[in-house]
């Protein structure tokens, strides 16, 4: 069972940068492979880590939602949406030599991120036993932590600046 470390705090205080540095440190210390999870709708951990990504979980959600209504998003006949989504999940995992990256991303439409958050939770649970460390870059605030989206969370690094608002958010 991998150690789950999550970043939390106000937006713009360096959570993603610190997350990238922690992933680099773990990899250089031989604690690899690391599962990096970008659980922010405004995903950019891949840029910090210097990797190109495939489809995000949010994009897969869009494909499921539009299937049947938009010819561009078709699920093959004879397969359920749930089975198709399960099959496509591997496409959302970007693999490198030292770490793998799972990106939540955002959907194009309006609405709640509950389904995409559920996908993050499910994937982390499925993958957790394959990695000694899982490092999660969260969106601003504490919602991911307080809602229990991250299973078996061991450590939360609260990142802040010196402002009153930054400390209140952390």
Residue spans for each PLM region:
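Hydrophobic/aromatic beta-strand patches that form the interior of the parallel beta-sheet core
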Residues: 5, 35-37, 100-102, 155-157
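Fold-independent oxyanion-binding glycine-rich loops
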Residues: 10, 39-40, 104-106, 138-139
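Active-site signature of alpha/beta-hydrolase-fold catalytic machinery across serine-
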Residues: 21, 25, 48, 148
């Amino acid at each position: 069972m991998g150690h789950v470390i999550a970043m939390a705090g106000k937006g713009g205080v360096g959570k993603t940068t610190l997350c990238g540095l922690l992933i680099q440190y773990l990899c250089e210390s031989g604690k690899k492979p690391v599962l990096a999870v970008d659980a922010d709708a405004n995903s950019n951990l891949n840029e910090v880590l210097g990797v190109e990504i495939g489809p995000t979980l949010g994009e897969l959600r869009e494909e499921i939602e539009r299937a049947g209504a938009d010819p561009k998003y078709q699920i093959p006949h004879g397969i359920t949406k749930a089975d198709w989504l399960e099959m496509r999940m591997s496409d959302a995992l970007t693999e490198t030599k030292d770490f793998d990256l799972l990106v939540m991303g955002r959907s194009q439409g309006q609405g709640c991120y509950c389904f995409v958050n559920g996908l993050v939770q499910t994937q982390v649970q499925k993958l957790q036993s394959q990695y000694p460390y899982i490092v999660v870059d969260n969106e601003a605030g504490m919602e991911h932590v307080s809602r229990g989206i991250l299973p078996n969370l061991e450590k939360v690094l609260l990142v802040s600046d010196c402002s009153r608002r930054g400390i209140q958010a952390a």
